[in-house]
Amino acid sequence: MDKLRKLHNSAKREMITTLVNKGDIVLDVGCGRGGDLHKWAATGCFLFACDPDIESVNEAQNRGLQYSEWCRIFHGDVLNFSDVICDAICYNFSLQYIFKDNQTLRSSLKSIAEHIKPGGLFFGVVPDANRILPLPEKWTDKLGNTIEHGSFCKNNRKTGNMIIVKMSDGPYYKNGAIPEPLCYNDILINEASEWFELQAWTKMIPETTGLISDIYSKFIFRRV
């Protein structure tokens, strides 16, 4: 799992350090336990970070004490964010949750747009339905990470379609497999087009690894 963690951290670090400039105001949605705080620190940005899981927020806030001059961590998501306008909003491994239903998708994208200045960026890493659905309906990589999906998800591309995910390591999956909504990039691009232009949609890791890393895509949208 160390190799997997390094791959994922490297991909996140590259995006963060490439797309965020010193002095930028950034919102990190789905910050988890604050494992990326040092990556944000390297950019010199002012960071707001949030997560819907209160246990994760508590740990992130403890980690963030040393960064208190430039970092604010709160419980929630973009829908209960303040009136601050950001240079960028990031969703690393968390955007799939706005695909819970049509209302959540639409309201989340609208709120993201309202909190980004014109020309600002909406970016991150997301499990990509186009990379998941070609896999066997129950697929396990050599590290024991497992994904399950049904054929219904292939033929009915819509919000609310779910997969079952179990990572063999990591506190989020400590109690077992978790259902997660599927992110369909065509739906996302279409719904976001009212406010954003797509700049990039590529594999998180360019080479095929045979690991769960292969299901993730990097995305960058620019606010119009």
Could you describe each region identified by the protein language model?
Residues 92-95:
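Residues lining the SAM
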Residues 34-78:
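Class I SAM-dependent methyltransferase SAM/SAH-binding core
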Residues 104-118:
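A short glycine-rich, Lys/Arg-flanked "PGG" loop and its adjoining helix->strand segment in the class I
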